[in-house]
UniProtKB/Swiss-Prot annotation:
Pfam families: ATP-synt_ab (PF00006), ATP-synt_ab_C (PF00306), ATP-synt_ab_N (PF02874). Keywords: ATP synthesis, ATP-binding, Cell inner membrane, Cell membrane, CF(1), Hydrogen ion transport, Ion transport, Membrane, Nucleotide-binding, Translocase, Transport. This is ATP synthase subunit alpha. Its main location: membrane. It comes from the Bacteria. Produces ATP from ADP in the presence of a proton gradient across the membrane. The alpha chain is a regulatory subunit. InterPro entries: ATP_synth_asu-like_sf, ATP_synth_asu_C, ATP_synth_asu_C_sf, ATP_synth_F1_a_nt-bd_dom, ATP_synth_F1_asu, ATPase_a/bsu_AS, ATPase_F1/V1/A1_a/bsu_N, ATPase_F1/V1/A1_a/bsu_N_sf. F-type ATPases have 2 components, CF(1) - the catalytic core - and CF(0) - the membrane proton channel. CF(1) has five subunits: alpha(3), beta(3), gamma(1), delta(1), epsilon(1). CF(0) has three main subunits: a(1), b(2) and c(9-12). The alpha and beta chains form an alternating ring which encloses part of the gamma chain. CF(1) is attached to CF(0) by a central stalk formed by the gamma and epsilon chains, while a peripheral stalk is formed by the delta and b chains. GO terms for cellular component: plasma membrane; proton-transporting ATP synthase complex. It is a peripheral membrane protein. It is an enzyme of class 7 (translocase). It comes from Salmonella arizonae (strain ATCC BAA-731 / CDC346-86 / RSK2980).
Amino acid sequence: MQLNSTEISELIKQRIAQFNVVSEAHNEGTIVSVSDGVIRIHGLADCMQGEMISLPGNRYAIALNLERDSVGAVVMGPYADLAEGMKVKCTGRILEVPVGRGLLGRVVNTLGAPIDGKGPVDNDGFSAVEAIAPGVIDRQSVDQPVQTGYKAVDSMIPIGRGQRELIIGDRQTGKTALAIDAIINQRDSGIKCIYVAIGQKASTISNVVRKLEEHGALANTIVVVATASESAALQYLAPYAGCAMGEYFRDRGEDALIIYDDLSKQAVAYRQISLLLRRPPGREAFPGDVFYLHSRLLERAARVNADYVEAYTKGEVKGKTGSLTALPIIETQAGDVSAFVPTNVISITDGQIFLESNLFNAGIRPAVNPGISVSRVGGAAQTKIMKKLSGGIRTALAQYRELAAFSQFASDLDDATRKQLDHGQKVTELLKQKQYAPMSVAQQSLVLFAAERGYLADVELAKIGSFEAALLAYVDRDHAPLMQEINQSGGYNDEIEGKLKGILDSFKATQSW
């Protein structure tokens, strides 16, 4: 059978039409060196700063150094089996983590994968770990409080929603305890919490998670974990991942609280990465951009106005402001707050709570030093009653510290000085508080009112603790409606003052402590 030319041309056309050409462009490179979790790649032409690079075995690295003929990247995860000559590909994507309400009550790693054995995590989408902080026009001033439940903090160093308040002190001074109690106190406040654990022991983190669960606070908390055994890259990225999860709530007109425990370890991890990438070291061998490392993270904690929230949600949420409050923790060495990282973070934040080891060892817990602890914007957010009653507390403590130092040398003191010393000692005793026992605004107000109005003058120093416990039990039993009213309104007027005075007068008459 012979085919004529027309049939041949038709057949060729048919074959051409059916021919399937699949071409996929890959930006591919070759690993030229692997050392301590850092890989150097040759041949990646169009790589972005911070881009995820796909490695063999379903792993990723992040491109941090873009040089003329090679790319320096840090591996997220195990790197022992990576070898010279392996092929890697650009993904064209920046690192993203899952965000949403489904993460609440879960323990996840830096990449948002669950590590609590409770199955997969529900998410409402993904967010880039690096985001630009809201601009000046998008922000609103801080004027609503975040109650930590600690008398010493809420009275003298108040924290507002959208503020960045540093918790700084040596190791074993109660920094994590203060942060965890702040989370426990948000149980019924509607504030969502994110706890980021950086470079800590897995056993310590499991204790924290258990305590949060025991006190019913885990249900509205996301725990992001990068343990000490994980790579420096994951420890460096953990705070940014946690921040992205917190921004989800902030941008939808809700309030969130994030704790970074602690940023000293993140700075050390970043220093390790930078030195391995052969970046020039500066002071204390930290790279030149260690200030920017923390400033770009902490600037993302802000209170955003209703217009920003409305624009972000495309009109779904109207008339609501959102906030992300940050409590970064920094560990000092022998109380040296003038080291490089502490001074950086002090200058970035809106105040600091300074915890001292000698106060902690003397049994004053929380070991807050009121002399150098300050809240630069929290005063505007304090409830009216706390603002009114806490004014004299700081003054009393400042005068007491001054007189205590002076009285060591003076043999005979006049009555006024003796009274001031006695009052200062009692206020110091009154501000002591046990862990996992946060107090409501009404309870704190009542105790501060007793100190302010001289109700402690005839109470022995050793009995201050039992006086406080008996007073709180008395009001819970007989005056619960007033406590509820103060908790809801936070207001202070002559009527409330009269009622508080009446409660204390009748309680003092019982002598039940």
